Amino acid sequence: MSRISLSNFLSLPRYKFLLFSVVLIIVMTTLVFNGHDYKQTLNDRLTSLKNNFVEENDNAVLKEEPGKYTYMSLFTMPSTEEDYYFNATRVLIHRLKYHPTTKSKYPIHILALRGVDEWKIERFRKDGASVIVIDPIASSDIVYDTSSFSQEISARYEQMFSKLRIFEQIQFDKICVIDSDILIMKNIDDIFDTPYMYQQINTLNYTRLPSYTKPDDDTVYHFNEDFKEYGASRSEFYPYLLAAVSDRGEHHSIPPEDTPYFNAGLMLIRPSELHFNRILKIGRFPYMYENAKMMEQSLLNLAFSLDGWFPWTRLDPYYNGVWPSIDERPLLKTAHGKFWNIGSSEFAPVYLADWYAAYGEMLSFHKYETH
C-alpha cells in the first residue's frame, strides 16, 4: 500500500486537504470507541460527511425530487356564457390521469382564480386534480400605465397575468405549465428530464438585447436589468429553468424552424419567488414587451430573452403542437388549439375529431357526470 508523504499531503488541493483531515479525525475518534462496531460507525459518518460536503461546497448541484414534479394549468372565470375552458380543463385532467397512452405518473394541479364557482372546483377534484385557489393578478396590479397596452383587453385576457403565480409555487421543484386548450396526444413525462440552468452568464452583448421605444420618445432603448432594484444579486437567481417551444405561424416547415420567441402555452419551469418578483417589476412597463400584445407571453419572452441573463431552454417542437398540420400529426406529442370550435377553418378537421373523441371518452369515464 502506498504511503502519503508530508510534502504530498501538504500539496493536496485545499478542499481535498480539509476533507482528508476531517476523515482522519473521524477515523481516530472512532477507533477509541469501546464495544462499538467501528466499521459501521465510520461508514455512517463518512456518508453523512459526504452529503454535507456536497450540500455546502457544491451549491451548483441541487437535489431534485421527482415527488415534487407536477403538471399545472390555470383556470379563470369565464368571459362568456359558455365556459369552454371548463370542459377543456376536464379533458386535460383526464388525459393526464386516466387515458392509457397519455396518463402521467405525476400529479396535476389546477390554479383556480378566487371567485371561480365552487362546483367547478369540486368537479376538478372528483376528476382527479388537486386545486390551488389563488388571488388574481390584474393588469392594473403591476402595470404603471395601462394605456400603453396594444389593444383593449378582454375580460378573460385581463386575467392572464395571474398565470405568473406559477413561479410562487415553490413547494414544487419543477412544474410543467400547460394551457387547457392543449390536447395531449402522447405521454410527455420525459419533459421533466430537462435540466436546470446552472451556468451563469458573465457578460452580455447589449446591442443584441431586446429593444423598445417609450411613449412619446423615438429613442431606441435596450432592455438592461438593474439587480439592485430586485434586492438580490444576480447569482441568487441561479439555477433557474424556463423551457418552452418556439412559437410558429400557421404555415410552418416540418420540422418547425427555431425562432427567438417562445409560446407560453406549455412551459417547464423551476418556481422561484425571486424570479416572480423580478417578472412583476419588469411588467410595469408594457412598452418594453410588445405593449403586452400577448399579455404574460410577451412579458415572459422579455424576462427570459435568449440574449439576456436568463435565456430560455428550447424543447422538442412537438411538445407544443402550435398550428398543427395534418402531415405532422404522427410526430406530435400535443396539439394546441381551440378544437372545440366546430366549423373552424383554422385547423384540419381531424384535430376537431380528436378533441371531441377525447371529450366523449372523458364524459363516458365519469358516467356523464357534469356537477
Swiss-Prot record:
<dbReference type="Pfam" id="PF01501">
    <property type="entry name" value="Glyco_transf_8"/>
</dbReference>
<keyword id="KW-0812">Transmembrane</keyword>
<comment type="similarity">
    <text>To S.pombe SpBC4C3.08 and SpBC4C3.09.</text>
</comment>
<dbReference type="GO" id="GO:0006493">
    <property type="term" value="P:protein O-linked glycosylation"/>
</dbReference>
<dbReference type="InterPro" id="IPR050587">
    <property type="entry name" value="GNT1/Glycosyltrans_8"/>
</dbReference>
<dbReference type="InterPro" id="IPR029044">
    <property type="entry name" value="Nucleotide-diphossugar_trans"/>
</dbReference>
<dbReference type="GO" id="GO:0005737">
    <property type="term" value="C:cytoplasm"/>
</dbReference>
<keyword id="KW-1133">Transmembrane helix</keyword>
<dbReference type="InterPro" id="IPR002495">
    <property type="entry name" value="Glyco_trans_8"/>
</dbReference>
<dbReference type="GO" id="GO:0016020">
    <property type="term" value="C:membrane"/>
</dbReference>
<protein>
    <recommendedName>
        <fullName>Uncharacterized protein C5H10.12c</fullName>
    </recommendedName>
</protein>
<dbReference type="GO" id="GO:0006487">
    <property type="term" value="P:protein N-linked glycosylation"/>
</dbReference>
<keyword id="KW-0472">Membrane</keyword>
<dbReference type="GO" id="GO:0005794">
    <property type="term" value="C:Golgi apparatus"/>
</dbReference>
<feature type="transmembrane region" description="Helical">
    <location>
        <begin position="17"/>
        <end position="33"/>
    </location>
</feature>
<dbReference type="GO" id="GO:0016757">
    <property type="term" value="F:glycosyltransferase activity"/>
</dbReference>
<dbReference type="GO" id="GO:0001962">
    <property type="term" value="F:alpha-1,3-galactosyltransferase activity"/>
</dbReference>
